[in-house]
């Protein structure tokens, strides 16, 4: 449903390459409520998403930047401010659960420093970099909404072989809480969302199977996560800050997480 709740607001979203991912879903959700957009990804596909959004009538500008390139991010932030005059909303959606190699799982004893640094960089440092690039402008204007995409994996549960990802996603929550206290009196809220099993274009067969064992019997959708982010980006959430909000279909509250017919 298109409304004007975010009309006059400008949002910057990271991780907007896949047509089936949470980043693009977030961009569409914010635009539906009237926001103008900046979208960023390391992939050239970000320009495809820009084209898609423009065809929907959205005011949008795309940036192809590595989120670990601090100078590139600062340049994008400066350009966004020049084009739109301000950035009110920052949604740090980008991240991934692998080491930059073909291996998906690797125990701590077998990790090398490069693999650890890759995961920490792409999940945690990227969030720090974009936040720092846009934060001063929000402080100067005494207004801002920052939403960080963490995960249930790390802050609340863990998997063997995923220690860098778990560490990074847990650290995002710590960053969220500390920053919320630093800038709360400047009318800036900072929150994190913790998705569980979400069906995206990057989901593996095992991840999709895991989604069938949630309390709701299905994985979530990028649109469902995007609507939560949109709520936190709106003034309806004006007194919510420093929080981690779980969106996982009731998965982590279960003691037993296998097929229901084997237990109930």
PLM feature spans:
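Alpha-helical segment proximal to the catalytic Tyr-Lys
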Residues: 136, 155, 181-182, 238
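Catalytic Tyr-X3-Lys loop
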Residues: 88, 96, 109-128, 143, ...
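Active-site helix of classical SDR
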Residues: 131, 168, 176
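Active-site Tyr-X3-Lys motif and surrounding loop/helix of classical short-chain dehydrogenase/reductase
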Residues: 75-82, 101-110, 114-121
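A conserved structural motif in NAD(P)-dependent oxidoreductases
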Residues: 214-225, 236
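Canonical Rossmann dinucleotide-binding motif of NAD(H)/NADP(H)-dependent dehydrogenases/reductases
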Residues: 4-38
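Short, small/polar-rich loop/turn modules that mediate ligand/substrate recognition or access, typified
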Residues: 184, 189, 240-242
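Short C-terminal tail/terminal secondary-structure segment
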Residues: 230, 241-264
């Amino acid at each position: 449903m298109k409304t004007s709740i975010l009309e006059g607001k400008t949002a910057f979203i990271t991780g907007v390459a896949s047509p089936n991912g949470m980043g693009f879903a977030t961009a569409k959700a914010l635009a539906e409520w009237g926001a103008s957009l900046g979208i960023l990804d390391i992939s050239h596909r970000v320009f495809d998403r820009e084209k898609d959004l423009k065809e929907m009538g959205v005011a949008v500008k795309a940036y192809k930047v590595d989120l670990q390139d601090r100078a590139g991010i600062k340049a994008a932030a400066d350009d966004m401010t020049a084009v739109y005059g301000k950035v009110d909303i920052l949604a740090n959606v980008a991240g991934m659960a692998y080491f930059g190699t073909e291996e998906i799982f690797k125990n701590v004893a077998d990790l090398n420093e490069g693999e650890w640094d890759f995961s920490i960089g792409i999940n945690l440092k990227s969030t720090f970099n974009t936040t720092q690039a846009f934060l001063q402008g929000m402080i100067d204007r005494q207004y801002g909404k920052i939403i960080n995409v963490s995960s249930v994996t790390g802050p609340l549960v863990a998997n063997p072989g995923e220690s860098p990802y778990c560490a990074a996603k847990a650290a995002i929550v710590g960053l969220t809480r500390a920053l919320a206290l630093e800038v709360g009196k400047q009318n800036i809220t900072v929150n994190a969302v913790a998705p569980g099993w979400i069906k995206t274009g990057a989901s593996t067969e095992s991840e999709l199977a895991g989604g069938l064992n949630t309390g709701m019997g299905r994985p979530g959708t990028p649109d469902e996560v995007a609507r939560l982010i949109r709520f936190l980006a709106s003034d309806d959430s004006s007194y919510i800050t420093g929080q981690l909000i779980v969106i996982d279909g009731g998965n982590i509250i279960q003691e037993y997480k296998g097929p229901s017919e084997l237990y109930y």
